[in-house]
């Protein structure tokens, strides 16, 4: 009975103070960061080319990445008050993610798609951010994960989230690379040897 009464009781003033611990600017960073990152994908989706070949196994990677994102929000983030360095780092991650999503979607044009697939007149894109990484969209997704996690997620949730993201992204990268290799042969092999997948380390 005491437990039920505690659940039904009206929150006290200090409870509201706890709920409001996360400052409004942190919410603004989250909303702005996600919206700026997502907008080019919604626009690209409207002009997506039909695919002639799709490998649906990549959806397992999509599922793992989705779970990774969900983990970011499982902590009581509304009670967290991020430190200045966390706020600054989060803004940097979101900014980089947004730049990559806009430039990557623009370079892909109508070839952008969620599934791993090839269109009938598919082109090998090596311009824009594709000069530095073969999958800049995935780099931008990593930036959003780190931008969100730095701001609101405790480390014991951020680490498994990052691990799931890497596993899911590796699945997608390998499947997409195999599709591109089957289409472009030696030309893609040379590009793959020269340019890293989604983390811009020099090869």
In which residue ranges do the predicted regions lie?
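Histidine-centered phosphotransfer motif of kinases
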Residues: 127, 131-139
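Membrane-anchoring alpha-helices and their flanking helix-loop junctions
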Residues: 7, 12-126, 144-203
């Amino acid at each position: 009975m005491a437990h039920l009464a505690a659940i039904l009781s009206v929150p006290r003033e200090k409870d509201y103070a706890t709920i409001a611990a996360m400052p409004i600017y942190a919410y603004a960073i989250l909303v702005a960061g996600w919206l700026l990152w997502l907008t080019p994908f919604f626009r690209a989706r409207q002009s997506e080319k039909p695919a002639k070949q799709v490998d649906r196994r990549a959806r397992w990677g999509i599922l793992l990445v989705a779970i990774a994102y969900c983990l970011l929000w499982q902590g009581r983030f509304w009670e967290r008050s991020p430190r200045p360095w966390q706020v600054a780092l989060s803004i940097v991650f979101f900014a980089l993610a947004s730049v990559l999503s806009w430039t990557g979607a623009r370079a892909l044009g109508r070839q952008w798609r969620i599934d791993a697939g090839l269109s009938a007149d598919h082109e090998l894109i090596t311009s824009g951010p594709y000069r530095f990484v073969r999958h800049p969209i995935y780099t931008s997704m990593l930036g959003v994960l780190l931008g969100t996690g730095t701001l609101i997620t405790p480390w014991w949730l951020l680490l498994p989230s990052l691990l799931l993201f890497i596993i899911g992204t590796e699945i997608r990268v390998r499947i997409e690379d195999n599709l591109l290799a089957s289409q472009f042969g030696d030309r893609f092999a040379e590009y793959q040897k020269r340019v890293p997948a989604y983390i811009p380390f020099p090869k």
